[in-house]
Amino acid sequence: MSVKIQQISPGDLTLYASVSIAFEARSVYRVETREQGLGGLLLVEELVDPYIKDYDAQAEGNDRPNQWAQQFDLRQWGFLMAMDGERAAGGAAVVMNSPEVHMLENRSDLAVLWDMRVQPEQRGKGIGRRLFQHAAEWARVKGCT
């Protein structure tokens, strides 16, 4: 079945949250400075014993998608779902014009990809790339650069 990307409303965040964000990590990255920072920074990858990283399981308070409305005004947010028939295959959340999100610097021409997730059994099929492309287009249409 072909996967279709569609926009959903904040009322559908329970469906969005049903997509697992957990993944297996096999390395960590460490920042090294060169010449006390004057020579730049180097990102060094270190292999570690594999472990499961699950941001939803680590989330506190209102950090899970189905709780975002308790912390943020979602009227200017864009929510995209990748649907494989009736099954949620992935999702992306894009934020703009949200004063609570300080990285936007109260500018109306900026957007940020807040969250992106793809079901584990759907990974490696290009769904994340398609969600990213749709998220970028959503922001462009809204006037973000």
Label the predicted regions.
Residues 104-120:
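Conserved acetyl-CoA binding element of GNAT-fold acetyltransferases
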